[in-house]
Amino acid sequence: MGKFTSFLKRAGSATKNALTSDAAKRMYKMAGKTLQKVVESEVGSSAIDGVMQGTIQSIIQGENLGDSIRQAVILNVAGTLESAPDPLSPGEQLLYNKVSEIERAEKEDRVIETHNKKIIEKYGEDLLEIRKIMKGEAEAEQLEGKEMEYVEKALKGMLKIGKDQSERITRLYRALQTEEDLRTSDETRMISEYREKFDALKQAIELEQQATHEEAMQEMLDLSAEVIETAAEEVPIFGAGQANVVATTRAIQGGLKLKEIIDKLTGIDLSHLKVADIHPHIIEKAMLKDRIPDNELAMAIKSKVEVIDEMNTETEHVIESIIPLVKKEYEKHDNKYHVNIPSALKIHSEHTPKVHIYTTPWDSDKVFICRCIAPHHQQRSFMIGFDLEVEFVFYEDTSVEGHIMHGGAVSIEGRGFRQAYSEFMNSLVYPSTPELHKRRLQRSLGSHPIYMGSMVITVSYEQLVSNAMKLVYDTDLQMHCLRGPLKFQRRTLMNALLFGVKVA
């Protein structure tokens, strides 16, 4: 357990002076319209919202112009995968989630319809039966009295799909670590196929980074959408040759409606079991100009294996520790579904393993807090709070509340969220705090923070902790995040927490 506090660092007056100096103006004139477009679209823009989060910082102090342009790149591909909306805008979050859900459902249906027979061969017909039930294509009587049977089939199906994905990517990871001369023909072919996908992703990112106006950017996003579909599945299940029907693990699992039937029949929410299609570490490697050695690429791929294994361990935890409790609830109702069963097993939405966002009742635009909860089997959480008015960040490992999804006793280590929140608020009141802001914080201290919503974690919990610690200590990263309008700063900080940022 630990607690860390720090003052955030912004680009200060030295940067401002450098940007407006006579030398800078001469260099702007020499650079012509290309640099002008970059600078004009820089502040508050997310023009390159797919790969770059819009912060191209030009610090012109007389050195080589090419060396002086810095790029802060969010390590996700937001235009076609995920990107965090403004954490203090529930409406924006809701709209984002709805749009993502519609796009995801359309993609999943296409994958299931295209690869129907192959899915049956690989994972069995029972999982397709679950999809038919959830889509209303099978008779309701088919489910009656067999609810627990279908719940167990769905959980075992999720674990089977997850372990298959882990095994496939682990084979690639081990092949990349093997000496080239000692690789089998299958390993050589596997690496060659993945290198093609990785190089295509690398090329798409390079084009994104070079784009200097929105029209070109839109074309690059369209191009990236195809590249990402194939790059998302490192070792294909099947159908990798056709970009419009690539069968990703997430699409198959979602299309089979496994989490939905579990939630409907038991009240157990497994929406947190989600893995980033392309892990941020892989995108980070793709950003580098030089060819990436096999061993470095292997370590980036290993990061995705770690997330998948974390999700599989969580599924095993549900099967071993939670399902016996579900069966007891069903026994109370003659082993048939009853409307009281989901409510008996449901936990509070603020205790689910996600990033939960809060703000203060007063001066809400300036202060926001993220409470990050690990998967249930880990029983861990931390809090990170930001005050953009006084440029302060606070981190503390916190204990989790006991509930049924832990499947037993909870180990209490450290203080709870409420105590950490109180200390964060007290830390903000010091002599140099503006008087009005200080009074508003003191009023907020006596009230519970306002809950603004949650976001799903798609990296491992350890990676999330690492991202948070960088926001506490990395002053270079802070300077890139704390630029532009407040809304944009909050969004950039949220993306930096969920995905990480590479300052290139």
From Swiss-Prot:
Pfam families recorded: Orbi_VP5 (PF00901)
Gene Ontology MF terms: structural molecule activity
Entry's Gene Ontology BP terms: symbiont entry into host cell via permeabilization of host membrane
Superkingdom of this protein's organism: Viruses
InterPro entries the UniProt entry points to: Capsid_VP5_Orbivir
Region (Involved in membrane permeabilization): 1-42
Compartment(s) of residence: Virion
One GO cellular component term noted in the UniProt record for this chain: viral outer capsid
Keyword field: Capsid protein, Outer capsid protein, Viral penetration into host cytoplasm, Viral penetration via permeabilization of host membrane, Virion, Virus entry into host cell
Protein role: VP5 protein is one of the two proteins (with VP2) which constitute the virus particle outer capsid. Acts as a membrane permeabilization protein that mediates release of viral particles from endosomal compartments into the cytoplasm. Permeabilization activity is probably negatively regulated by VP2 and is triggered by endosomal degradation of VP2 and exposure to low pH.
Family the entry assigns: Belongs to the orbivirus VP5 family.
Name recorded for this polypeptide: Outer capsid protein VP5
Organism: African horse sickness virus 6 (AHSV-6)
Lineage of the organism: Viruses, Riboviria, Orthornavirae, Duplornaviricota, Resentoviricetes
